[in-house]
Amino acid sequence: VYMGNVCSGYLGQAPARQSVIFAGLPKSTICTTVNKVCSSGMKSVMLATQGLQTGTQDVILAGGMESMSNVPYYLKRGETAYGGMQLVDGIVFDGLTDVYNKFHMGNCAENTAKKLEITRQQQDEYAISSYKRSAAAYEAKAFADELVPVPVPQKRGAPPILFTEDEEYKKVNFEKFNKLATVFQKENGTVTAGNASTLNDGAAALVLMTADAAQRLNVKPLARVVGYADGECDPIDFPIAPAVAIPKLLEKTGVKKEDVALWEINEAFSVVAVANQKILELDPAKVNVHGGAVSLGHPIGMSGARLVVHLCHALKKGEKGVAAICNGGGGASSIMIEK
C-alpha cells in the first residue's frame, strides 16, 4: 500500500500503515507513506505502477489522504522566551509555504498570473465555470460510482452522520464573486478565496494489479496505465510545472495531444488550470469537465489520486485521459490512463 499524506504532524507513526490496520487489512500488508506535497496521491499511483512493472508485487493499493481540519499548530521546543511564544500553523508551514522564497503558494500563483498576463476576470470566470460544472456533475450523478459514504461520529451519543457528497460546490455565492478581496497581493492582485481551492478533508484510493493478477482474481479492470512522467521547474513557477511534465508524458507514450479525450489538471488555484491550458493549447471543453479543486476541495495529499480515480470513471471505453498536478517546490506529476 502506498498512501500520500503531506501534513503528518500529530497523526502518529506511519499514517499509511494506520490506514491499512484500521481498515482491517492483513497485518502482513507492506505500507509506505508518500509525501510529494500536492502530487503525493498521484505519485503513490505511479510508485504502485512501477512496483507492478518490476514484478515486486502483483496487487497494490495506492491513494492519498489528508485531514486539513486536524493539522495542529506547532510550538518550538526549548525554554519559553521573554515576551511569549508563537504558534505556527502546520497547514501553512508544511503545506502551503514556498520554502525557497519564504512566502505563500498564492504569491507564486500571482507571479504566474503576472508572467502570463492572466487577469482576475479570467480566473474568476474559470472558477465560476468549475463550480457550475461540479453542480451539473452532481445533478447528473457523474460522481456516483466513485464516492464511498463515510459515517462521521457525533458528540454526546448522537447517531453518526452519513457523509455522501462533497460540500464545497454548494457554498458559492456568484453575486459576491467578483467583489471578493485579493488575498496575497493587495494592489493589482488577482487571486481570491473564490478563485483558489479550499482547505478540506478527504481520501481517495485505487487498486492496481498486473493483468495476470486480474485474471487470477477474476476482476475486470476499469482502466490501464499507459505511462507517467514527472517534471520540475523553478519553485516560484510551480503552477506551470504540469506544462513541463505533460509534454514529457506525451513524448514517452507516443500519444498526440489531440488523441487525449479528457484532461484533469489540479485547480490548486484557477490560474494553474488557465495557465497550463494556455501554454499547452488545450481545449477548455476537455479540461476538468466536472470541476476540480476550486469547486470540490483540495485535501493536499489526496487530490492527485482523486484525479486518477475520476478519469477512470469519466472516460468512455477506448478513450485516453491525462491527469496532472503541480506541487510545491516547482514540481509536477502526470499520468495517462486508457479506459
Residues of each region from the PLM?
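Flexible glycine-/small-residue-enriched beta->alpha junction loops
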Residues: 59-111
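Short, well-ordered amphipathic alpha-helical segments that serve as non-catalytic structural scaffolds
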Residues: 15-19, 44-47, 105-112, 128-133, ...
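Active-site-proximal alpha-helical scaffold in enzymes
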Residues: 36-66, 113-142, 205-212, 277, ...
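Condensing-enzyme catalytic core mediating Claisen C-C bond formation in acyl metabolism
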Residues: 174-238, 244, 309, 314-321, ...
